């Protein structure tokens, strides 16, 4: 985790805009996990893991694209490997698009569609109003 934070810090100094997409396996906030009270000592929601994500989206200034446009709960991207967990939506939001601050204003919409499923993870789809230049 520390190596990735160092990498993000190094990239930030390049003064370019970046979007980092992937599964961080950390539910940062209470609304990113269904049963947060029971999960405070579980991997993926441990205080040091959440503090690491807080540092990335706080002190380091990166932006969580989903939370930029939605503060709703029950938006999860991963469920334990059993049908009942998914049926009851006992999920975690482990998947992120983390942006450099300059891209914040371009986020228009974000969603985690549960179908179709290609793995245990739902895709995080973010719409940007941004013209890509090469």
What are these regions (language model features)?
Residues 2-90, 94:
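Metal-dependent phosphoesterases centered on the DNase I-like endonuclease/exonuclease/phosphatase
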Residues 62, 95, 107, 123:
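A residue-level signal for beta-strand positions that form part of recognition/binding surfaces
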Residues 66-69, 102, 114:
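Residues at the C-termini of beta-strands that transition into short coil/loop
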Residues 79-80, 107-114:
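Short, solvent-exposed helix-loop connector elements
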Residues 103-106, 133-134:
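Short helix-loop capping/hinge motifs at secondary-structure junctions, enriched
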Residues 111-134:
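Surface polyanion/phosphate-binding segment centered on an Asp-His-Pro turn
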């Amino acid at each position: 985790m520390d190596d990735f934070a160092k990498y993000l810090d190094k990239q930030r100094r390049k003064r370019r805009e970046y979007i980092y997409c992937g599964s961080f396996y950390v539910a940062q906030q209470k609304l990113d996990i269904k049963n947060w009270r029971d999960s405070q000592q579980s991997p993926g929601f441990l205080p040091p893991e959440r503090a690491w994500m807080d540092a990335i989206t706080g002190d380091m200034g990166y932006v969580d694209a989903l939370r930029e446009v939605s503060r709703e709960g029950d938006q999860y991207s991963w469920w334990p490997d059993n049908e009942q967990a998914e049926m009851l939506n006992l999920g975690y939001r482990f998947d992120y698009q983390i942006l450099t601050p300059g891209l914040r204003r371009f986020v228009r919409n974000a969603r985690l569609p549960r179908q179709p499923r290609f793995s245990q993870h739902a895709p995080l789809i973010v719409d940007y109003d941004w013209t890509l230049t090469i």
